[in-house]
UniProtKB/Swiss-Prot annotation:
It is found in: Secreted. It holds the Pfam family Conotoxin. Probable neurotoxin. The presence of a 'disulfide through disulfide knot' structurally defines this protein as a knottin. Keywords: Disulfide bond, Knottin, Neurotoxin, Secreted, Signal, Toxin. This is Conotoxin Im6.9. Residues 20-45 form a propeptide. One of its GO terms (molecular function) is toxin activity. It comes from Conus imperialis (Imperial cone). Coiled coil: none annotated. One of its GO terms (cellular component) is extracellular region. Residues 1-19 form the signal peptide. Expressed by the venom duct. Belongs to the conotoxin O2 superfamily.
């Protein structure tokens, strides 16, 4: 009877550990999908007006679609 109780306890611990590990993996996978689905291409950012095309005045590289700012957005 003692062996059966110990076996059941060990089984319960192993199953709960597996469940915790599985939920952690699923959370990481969902986070990766969410991160990559938010990224837009340069063309999408330009089309939606989120960045400036070249020869437009800028104050930081993040404003330019090319990511290159020197008073005006540069093509490259």
């Amino acid at each position: 009877m003692e062996k059966l109780t110990i076996l059941l306890l060990v089984t319960a611990v192993l199953m709960s550990t597996q469940a915790l590990m599985q939920s952690g993996i699923e959370k990481r996978q969902r986070a990766k999908i969410k991160f990559f689905s938010k990224r837009k291409t340069t063309a999408e950012r330009w089309w939606e007006g989120e960045c400036y095309d070249w020869l437009r005045q800028c104050s930081s590289p993040a404003q330019c679609c090319s990511g290159n700012c020197g008073a005006h957005c540069k093509a490259w």
